[in-house]
Amino acid sequence: MKLTCALIVTLLFLSITAGDSRGKHRYNALKSMSREANSTERECREKGQGCTNTALCCPGLECEGQSQGGLCVDN
């Protein structure tokens, strides 16, 4: 009986707290990550800077040696 009551109280508490935080980011890091993911403008890498799949070179440059940590070079 005591176990059942404790279980019911726990479930009520969890359901109330889960419903209260809906739509809110708990951590600032999550806010900045979601803002960054939604951003359509990204900084590009200049000539001689490192590039990857996510850090792209500026227009007119290409990423050479990308699989090993590439560099932006002229097209």
UniProtKB/Swiss-Prot annotation:
Domain of life: Eukaryota
Any GO molecular function: ion channel inhibitor activity
Keywords (A to Z) from UniProt: Disulfide bond, Knottin, Neurotoxin, Secreted, Signal, Toxin
Known tissue expression: Expressed by the venom duct.
Transmembrane annotation, as ranges: none
Propeptide: 20-42
Coiled-coil portions: none
A GO cellular-component term linked to this record: extracellular region
Signal peptide, first to last residue: 1-19
UniProt protein name: Conotoxin MiEr95
